[in-house]
């Protein structure tokens, strides 16, 4: 039996869109390539603290941060309304591929290590309001640390273990 610990949280279902059972969703992962590659892709709704599989049959982007999803067996706006606000998950095995791109928000809750393997802290928030994206990290001492993040500073992203290994410029941890 699949439990929530074996799944990756990828977003929340929003309100229904239209009359045929589609819904808005804010996702932290871009599933477009995976949706095209997989013959049958299942996403999981968290219902009564249990993961319930639903087959994804429709996927299209509405705006930069809103995706429209359609699931088998949900044929109307009324049927979809009961799932508004439900957390959405998918199997972690899909995250071992290069078919998924993430938003920075997806990394909230990940642990951060420097390139020597020393624990830096846990990501609590992401600030994308500046030119450089900043990770808000709580250190083991309870101190808040803001780290700029760019692809050249990311040494390893381990999604299944929710871990980032970063190249942290000298002196940044002492600020």
Curated annotation (Swiss-Prot):
Its main location: cytoplasm. One of its GO terms (molecular function) is ribosome binding. Keywords: Chaperone, Cytoplasm, Ribosome biogenesis, rRNA processing. The keyword Chaperone applies. Pfam families: PRC_RimM, RimM. The keyword Ion transport does not apply. GO terms for biological process: ribosomal small subunit biogenesis; rRNA processing. GO terms for cellular component: cytoplasm; ribosome. It is found in: Cytoplasm. Residues 99-172 form the PRC barrel domain. The PRC barrel domain binds ribosomal protein uS19. Binds ribosomal protein uS19. NCBIfam families: 16S_RimM. An accessory protein needed during the final step in the assembly of 30S ribosomal subunit, possibly for assembly of the head region. Essential for efficient processing of 16S rRNA. May be needed both before and after RbfA during the maturation of 16S rRNA. It has affinity for free ribosomal 30S subunits but not for 70S ribosomes. PANTHER family: RIBOSOME MATURATION FACTOR RIMM (PTHR33692:SF1). Belongs to the RimM family. This is Ribosome maturation factor RimM.
